[in-house]
A protein has these predicted regions:
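The feature captures the beta-strand-to-loop junction immediately N-terminal to the Walker
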Residues: 42-44
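ABC ATPase NBD coupling module
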Residues: 20, 74-92, 110, 118, ...
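Short catalytic/signature loops enriched in Gly
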Residues: 4-5, 22, 233-280
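Conserved ABC ATPase signature
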Residues: 148-152, 156
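Helix-to-loop junction immediately C-terminal to a conserved catalytic motif
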Residues: 57
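Conserved ABC ATPase "signature" region
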Residues: 126-143, 252-253
């Protein structure tokens, strides 16, 4: 087995101008993801998850630090067709809303065919066979291939979006709240599918979520972000059994359960924010 991580983030920092100063969105973020691994990036709105995702897929350039995919630097805002295609083959993303990656005017099969053609598969029968293979991989068939996105259920659309991302055989798949809009039973089906895919292909998954239950289900490790910083990074089982940081404990307490105390949680949240502001 290779000892080179599929994906490595080292000392990432990203700021944005705001007024006369700069807002620190991500500060000193580091992690490694190996073949077949699954890392959960956990945090609420404003934690830095979205900025991190944009850096991982090359849409933003970090102010400091670097991102390596299979040992090679990931270029941001790449110019030139060949370079853009190479970046797409390194890291793909599946969004919460599959309509962001599926053209509503084109059938699912034609969408997949177009991706394969764009990435150099000129042989039509070979593309048709690969489309069938991709659809089968995500549990879809000929009926779904012929359908427009609006003719599919939410779960089927998300499966189609996953198939589209897998078409280029990326090293890493980033899933940005990819199941949060689905019913719980459909969530479980998609999460099982993702677990099967990483086992069968060795692809690395980065699962971005505010939902610790989802992270528990599919990830090996979890990295908890708060105000742009990593506050905890552990194997999922250890993090959930014995969270070390007050924010991680607050996230766990925020999940509804018998004896749930929303007012107490809100008070703890304000106290944590005040203590962090005082520390900074």
């Amino acid at each position: 087995l290779s000892t080179t991580p599929l994906l490595q983030a080292a000392g990432l920092r990203k700021t944005y101008p705001t007024g006369g100063s700069r807002l620190v969105a991500v500060e000193d973020l580091s992690f490694s993801l190996y073949a077949g691994g699954a890392l959960g990036l956990v945090g609420e709105s404003g934690s830095g998850k979205t900025t991190t995702v944009r850096m991982l897929v090359g849409l933003e350039r970090p102010d400091q630090g670097e991102i390596l995919v299979q040992g090679a630097p990931l270029a941001a805002r790449t110019r030139g067709r060949a370079a853009r295609l190479a970046r797409a083959k390194a890291v793909q993303i599946v969004f919460q809303d599959p309509y962001l990656s599926l053209d509503g005017r084109i059938s699912i099969g034609a969408t997949l065919d177009g991706v394969l053609r764009l990435h150099g598969c000129a042989d039509r029968p070979a593309r048709a066979a690969r489309v069938r293979e991709l659809l089968a991989q995500v549990g879809l068939g000929a009926r779904e291939a012929a359908a427009l996105p609006r003719g599919l259920s939410g779960g089927q659309r998300q499966r189609a979006a996953i198939a589209r991302a897998l078409a280029v055989e990326p090293a890493v798949l980033v899933l940005d709240e990819a199941v949060s809009a689905l019913d719980v039973s459909v969530q479980a089906q998609v999460l099982n599918l993702l677990s099967d895919i990483r086992r069968d292909t060795g692809i690395g998954l980065v699962f971005v979520s505010h939902d610790l239950a989802v992270v528990r289900y599919v990830c090996d490790e979890a990295l908890v972000m708060y105000r742009g910083r990593t506050v905890e990074h552990q194997p999922v089982a250890e993090l959930l059994a014995a969270p070390q940081h007050p924010y991680t404990r607050l996230l766990l307490a925020s999940v509804p359960h018998p004896g749930w105390d929303p007012e107490g949680i809100g008070r703890r949240r304000r106290e944590l924010a005040s203590s962090q502001e005082a520390a900074s």
